[in-house]
């Protein structure tokens, strides 16, 4: 089962980010989060964004990225990639 994702979209509605916990990590001392980046293609909501990259960060670093994006005008949004 995939971890619940948390989503952000930029103010131009051209890019999205999905933050999900990496439940498969074997590190017993740190939690890790995947940050998936995608580009909106076509009409938003009609087609899934094009996945451009996946990066993995420690939880604290992922929180800093989230906060930085929010400060730059990104907003929470609903899921845009299917399960």
Where are these regions (language model features)?
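Terminus-proximal functional modules
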Residues: 1-83
């Amino acid at each position: 089962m995939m971890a619940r994702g948390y989503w952000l979209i930029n103010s131009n509605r051209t890019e999205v980010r999905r933050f999900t916990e990496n439940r498969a990590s074997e590190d017993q001392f740190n939690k890790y989060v995947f940050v998936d980046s995608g580009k909106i293609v076509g009409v938003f909501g009609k087609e899934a964004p094009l996945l451009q990259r996946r990066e993995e960060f420690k939880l604290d670093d992922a929180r800093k990225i989230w906060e930085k994006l929010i400060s730059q005008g990104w907003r929470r949004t609903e899921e845009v990639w299917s399960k």
